[in-house]
UniProtKB/Swiss-Prot annotation:
Function: Acts as a chaperone.
Protein name: Chaperone protein DnaK
PROSITE patterns: HSP70_1, HSP70_2, HSP70_3
Protein's gene: dnaK
Positions of post-translational Phosphothreonine modification: 198
Swiss-Prot/TrEMBL keywords: ATP-binding, Chaperone, Nucleotide-binding, Phosphoprotein, Stress response
NCBIfam families documented for this protein: PRK00290.1, PRK05183.1, prok_dnaK
Record organism: Azorhizobium caulinodans (strain ATCC 43989 / DSM 5975 / JCM 20966 / LMG 6465 / NBRC 14845 / NCIMB 13405 / ORS 571)
Phylogenetic classification of the source organism: Bacteria, Pseudomonadati, Pseudomonadota, Alphaproteobacteria, Hyphomicrobiales
Phosphoprotein as UniProt keyword: yes
Length: 631
């Protein structure tokens, strides 16, 4: 059985880990890094780049470089958060045919699940090259506060990447697994997870291998990206005051600002001051303009204090739902790159009244937890039981647009709940069941997950038919709903596919796309390698011809020159096979030249049969002669 891997699919960075015996191991990618930027880019000629190579060219190719796409996954185009996101990114966010938010590059539309799949493919390849075998199954993490549509879209991304997603696991829960696996003592912990794009807080009880989530809360649109944008806006405002130019209108300058802001933010976690230096950031009639600015930690903290403050309310609600006070928390575990910021640590300490635990690597701990859960599913990790919860209440719309809850938030999953409803009018023969997720009292204020019709109800006075609605939430937090007319036994069941979302045909098409992309990438690599070999041979043959061409016969020299010309022509094409064939032909034709070179070399060594030491002495003598000449 092939290994099941654990993947932390992050907003800013992703990470992959696997169980090696009894302990989890984070796997380094092809670039030698333990985390991979969650960035996908397309070059002008359509080549796809993922991770660090994509990040490196982001400044010069902002419109085709997709970052923080996790913020769009499972969201509708007219969602207010998407509206906000469109203003923050240099790439195009567009409305898909199904009403979802997608992205566009050179007229081709991609779903956020597809972009995420390209990142997952990279993680899959990273694991495969380390393990030396094919990987087909994975555990993938999501923010605890992700709704059903976002979880389903993440599962779809795995499928597009060629992975069977055995389990979707919440990020704070994964972190708790990694933190508590080898600890013998029991206790109550809070996991404070502030990542690149999302914030979660979970309260768990740990003891005897049982990890029980008591409550969870969060904000799926709050993270490091927002901290970066605060700094970008501050720098742009200061520059505008000074130079009268708004850098936000220039996509290239905006991307440079974003990179500088991220770098400054990271530096200010360890230094109290940093300098931002961006020469030639823009130009006007008077010439080029440079941005140089000193930034103190105190100034940065003042710019983002309200963002950190926003994380405190979910912490308060999570404690309230768990029925605990801050003093009853034994340990606070910090997760996510943003928790390296001293001000974040300080505010967490103030809120919980204790020094937070910094013994886990905030960038890797979630992937490690996913690998442990993969080990549990594989049977390699024994005596570990994970009891997670659903983050949001689930229910249906009833008379007057009221949201009637069937399953309350923080209910342990998997779970199943049924309730009987009736018709609202006399003679009603069909009922539309509209399914919502959220905490507001009116259905319209919550997130609609989908709707379906139960038809063929025998006509009867209002209130007489009995319709039983059953909600079923699996261990991934994904919902199935069925409705049954108890009179006729007629049943209608759906796996909630978000009002948008990808259907099976979409996913199949994207799987094929991903496979053809992988094939294209292989072709590109083969072409690049063929050109490298060909160009190297052209160079060495030309050099050899100029130095030793007189040592072979005219016919042989003509054959070499002809093969050389043919290879040069082939190198101007995109045909890898033709280049390889012509490279082979030139190598064959040059054999005689190689022989002539070797025999000339050996012939030169015959007289006096000089030793190596003498050769070195001769070099020194030449230098001395030069010195005498110049004297």
């Amino acid at each position: 059985m092939s290994k099941i891997i654990g993947i932390d699919l992050g907003t800013t960075n992703s990470c992959v880990a696997v169980m090696e015996g009894a302990s989890p191991k984070v796997i380094e990618n092809a670039e030698g890094a333990r985390t991979t930027p969650s960035i996908v880019a397309f070059t002008e000629d359509g080549e796809r780049l993922v991770g660090q190579p994509a990040k490196r060219q982001g400044v010069t190719n902002p419109e085709r470089t997709f970052f923080a796409v996790k913020r769009l996954i499972g969201r509708r185009y007219d969602d207010p958060t998407v509206e906000k996101d469109k203003k923050l990114v240099p790439y195009k966010v567009v409305r898909a045919d199904n009403g979802d938010a997608w992205v566009e590059s050179d007229g081709k539309k991609y779903s956020p699940s597809q972009i995420s799949a390209f990142i997952l493919q990279k993680m899959k390849e990273t694991a495969e090259s380390f393990l030396g075998e094919k990987v087909e199954k994975a555990v993938i993490t999501v923010p605890a506060y992700f709704n059903d549509a976002q979880r389903q879209a993440t599962k779809d991304a795995g499928r597009i990447a060629g992975l069977e997603v055995l389990r979707i696991i919440n990020e704070p829960t994964a972190a708790a697994l990694a933190y508590g696996l080898d600890k013998k003592n029991s206790g109550t912990i809070a996991v404070y997870d502030l990542g690149g794009g999302t914030f979660d807080v979970s309260v768990l009880e740990i003891g005897d291998g049982v990890f029980e989530v008591k409550s969870t809360n969060g904000d799926t649109f709050l993270g490091g990206e927002d901290f970066d944008m605060r700094l970008v806006n501050y720098l742009a405002d200061e520059f505008k005051k000074e130079q009268g130019i708004d850098l936000r209108n220039d996509k290239l300058a905006l991307q440079r600002l974003k990179e500088a802001a991220e770098k400054a933010k990271i530096e200010l976690s360890s230094a109290t001051q940093t300098e931002i230096n961006l020469p030639f950031i823009t130009a006007d009639a008077s010439g080029p303009k440079h941005l140089t600015m000193k930034l103190t930690r105190a100034k940065f903290e003042a710019l983002v204090e309200d963002l950190i403050q926003r994380t405190m309310e979910p912490c308060r609600l999570a404690l309230k739902d768990a029925g605990l006070s801050a003093g009853q928390i034994d340990e606070v575990v910090l997760v996510g790159g943003m928790t390296r910021m001293p001000k974040v640590q300080e505010m967490v300490k103030q809120f919980f009244g204790k020094e937070p635990h910094k013994g886990v690597n905030p960038d890797e701990v979630v992937a490690i937890g996913a690998a442990i859960q993969a080990g549990v599913l594989q049977g390699d990790v024994k005596d570990v039981l994970l009891l997670d919860v659903t983050p949001l209440s689930l229910g249906i719309e009833t008379l007057g647009g009221v949201f009637t809850r069937l399953i309350d938030r923080n209910t342990t999953i998997p779970t199943k709940k049924s309730q009987v409803f009736s018709t609202a009018e006399d003679g009603q023969t069909a009922v539309t069941i509209r399914v919502f997720q959220g905490e507001r009292e009116m259905a319209a204020d919550n997130k609609i997950l989908g709707q379906f019709d139960l038809v063929g109800i025998p006509p009867a006075p209002r209130g007489v038919p009995q319709i039983e609605v059953t909600f079923d939430i699996d261990a991934n937090g994904i919902v199935q709903v069925s409705a049954k007319d108890k009179g006729t036994g007629k049943e209608q069941q759906i796996r909630i596919q978000a009002s948008g979302g990808l259907n099976d045909a979409d996913i199949e098409k994207m799987v094929k796309d991903a496979e053809s992309h992988a094939a294209d990438d292989k072709k590109r690599r083969a072409l690049a390698e063929a050109k490298n070999h060909g160009e190297a041979l052209v160079h060495s043959t030309e050099k050899a011809l100029s130095e030793h061409g007189d040592k072979v016969g005219a016919a042989e020299k003509g054959a070499i020159e002809s093969a050389l010309g043919e290879l040069k022509t082939a190198l101007t094409t995109e045909d890898a096979e033709a280049i390889q064939a012509k490279t082979q032909a030139l190598a064959q034709a040059s054999l005689k030249l190689g022989e002539a070179m070797y025999s000339a070399q050996q012939g030169g060594e015959q007289p006096g049969a000089a030793k190596k030491d003498d050769v070195v002495d001769a070099e020194f003598t030449e230098v001395d002669d030069d010195k005498k000449k110049s004297a």
